[in-house]
């Protein structure tokens, strides 16, 4: 999808405020929902994915199962709200041995397991909104001893709220981020005593 696109800086694949946030995504829902709601903490539209079973309610990009993203930027960043329920996401990458590998992170696992085509790992989320930064270059090298070439697919499962999902060429400090990539929390007016 993005193979022939010049890639530098930031490349967003989901923005909850956009007119069609799931334009390039496919949805699967069983015993749950995927809908856009206003989150009270940030007073803004977000995408909520909820389901009784994490494996049967998810969004996947690209929508066409025969297509791949072709994103070469090595950092995946997701702005996600912890709903204090089971949550998992998966990223499929291509390495320099021309092997498709999957990384699956979830908040209900306690150990990392590396198998030839999939690496599953635990993920700890703080209360409220989190910025998940995933260094695909480093994970591919550490898990498989190979070099990351590109990201083929991203799949985000229940249960979470999503503000944005993007790729970047490096990790950026809060000051360096473009305004629309920051998560603004409303300023609390504290009464003077």
From Swiss-Prot:
Species annotation: Homo sapiens
Entry similarity comment: Belongs to the CFAP20 family.
Keywords assigned by UniProt, alphabetized: Cell projection, Cilium, Cytoplasm, Cytoskeleton, Flagellum, Microtubule, Nucleus
Main localisation: nucleus
Quaternary organization: Microtubule inner protein component of sperm flagellar doublet microtubules.
Function, in words: Cilium- and flagellum-specific protein that plays a role in axonemal structure organization and motility. Microtubule inner protein (MIP) part of the dynein-decorated doublet microtubules (DMTs) in cilia axoneme, which is required for motile cilia beating. Involved in the regulation of the size and morphology of cilia. Required for axonemal microtubules polyglutamylation.
GO BP terms, alphabetized: cilium assembly; flagellated sperm motility; positive regulation of cell motility; positive regulation of feeding behavior; protein polyglutamylation; regulation of cilium beat frequency involved in ciliary motility
Protein's recorded name: Cilia- and flagella-associated protein 20
GO function terms (MF aspect): RNA binding
Pfam families named among the record's database cross-references: CFA20_dom
């Amino acid at each position: 999808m993005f193979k022939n696109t010049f890639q530098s800086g930031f490349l967003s694949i989901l923005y909850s405020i956009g007119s069609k946030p799931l334009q390039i995504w496919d949805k699967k829902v069983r015993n749950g929902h995927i809908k856009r709601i206003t989150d009270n903490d940030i007073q803004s539209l977000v995408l909520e994915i909820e389901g009784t079973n994490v494996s049967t309610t998810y969004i996947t990009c690209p929508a066409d199962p025969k297509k791949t993203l072709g994103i070469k930027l090595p950092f995946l960043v997701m702005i996600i709200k912890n709903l204090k329920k089971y949550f998992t996401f998966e990223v499929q990458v291509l390495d320099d041995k021309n092997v498709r590998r999957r990384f699956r992170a979830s908040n209900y696992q306690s150990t990392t397991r590396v198998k030839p085509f999939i690496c599953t790992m635990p993920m700890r989320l703080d209360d409220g909104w989190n910025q998940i930064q995933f260094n695909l270059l480093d994970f591919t090298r550490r898990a498989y001893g190979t070099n990351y070439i590109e990201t083929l697919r991203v799949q985000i499962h229940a249960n979470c709220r999503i503000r944005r999902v993007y790729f970047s060429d490096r990790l950026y400090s809060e000051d360096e981020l473009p305004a629309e990539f920051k998560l603004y929390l409303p300023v609390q007016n504290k009464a003077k005593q």
